[in-house]
Amino acid sequence: MSTLLEKTRKVNRILQKTGIQPVDFNEMASILKDVIEANVYILSRKGKVLGYSILKDYGNDIFAQSKIIPEEYNDKLLRVTETLANDKGNLFKEDKILSDLILTIVPVNGGGDRLGTLVLSRGVKEFTDDDLILAEYGATVVGLEILRSKNEEIEDEARKRAVVQMALGTLSYSELEAIKNIFEELNGKEGLLVASKIADKVGITRSVIVNALRKFESAGIIESRSLGMKGTHIRVLNDKLLEELEKMKR
């Protein structure tokens, strides 16, 4: 039988992957399931099921069946501010399945904020002190991974915005006017462009429009496909483009 130290080391392996592989909350839940020997559910602060792993199927479990749990369930979880161990039939009295299970609820915190909730369930056997130590350590690891995924998202947003700003900076005045009018005409993330129509409207040549589109395409901001006489189909790949163009109108 694995000792507490051996089990802790298994959980710690999740951290060793940090920065090497994308966050996989199902894998994290699976590791916690194996070391704690319980069903494990990782939820975001808003009640989204980030990942889960089932040791034993107890029926139509709301946490496993939903991508986002009902708001009233999540509100109850968020009211749990410290580990609630071995709850049976108190927290979810109205739920026939959950009220028959032994639940342990561990808040997931990080950076001074509530990031989510770790929910553990069993049929009969209560959670021991060793189980609770592993659960709380697991919640800490989950919190670090949620923070990392949030930081990666922020970094990706900043990178996409920087690419758009640099591409806009390479445009001449005429090309910038062409781009503004093109996406005003499209009125969305994709559509059909008739270059001659824009050229007449802005008072520029078609070559200016072509050059502007090429710069954006080479930067990976848009993709375009010629439809011959019908025009050119344009699709926005970087959604920060529309945000930056909108700012220019203010």
From Swiss-Prot:
Disulfide bonds: none
Cross-referenced Pfam families: CodY, HTH_CodY
BP terms from Gene Ontology: negative regulation of DNA-templated transcription
Subcellular location: Cytoplasm
Membrane-crossing residue ranges in chain numbering: none
Subcellular location, principal: cytoplasm
Record bears the keyword Transcription regulation: yes
DNA-binding annotation, residue ranges on this chain: 195-214
GO molecular function per UniProt: DNA binding; DNA-binding transcription factor activity; GTP binding
Coiled coil stretches, renumbered: none
Keywords recorded for this protein, A-Z: Cytoplasm, DNA-binding, Repressor, Transcription, Transcription regulation
Cellular component, GO annotation: cytoplasm
UniProt-annotated stretches for the region GAF domain: 1-147
Summary of the function given for this chain in its UniProt record: DNA-binding global transcriptional regulator which is involved in the adaptive response to starvation and acts by directly or indirectly controlling the expression of numerous genes in response to nutrient availability. During rapid exponential growth, CodY is highly active and represses genes whose products allow adaptation to nutrient depletion.
Cited NCBIfam families: codY_Gpos, PRK04158.1
PANTHER family: GLOBAL TRANSCRIPTIONAL REGULATOR CODY, GTP-SENSING TRANSCRIPTIONAL PLEIOTROPIC REPRESSOR CODY
Family of the protein in this entry: Belongs to the CodY family.
Identification of the protein by name: Global transcriptional regulator CodY
Organism from which the protein derives: Thermoanaerobacter sp. (strain X514)
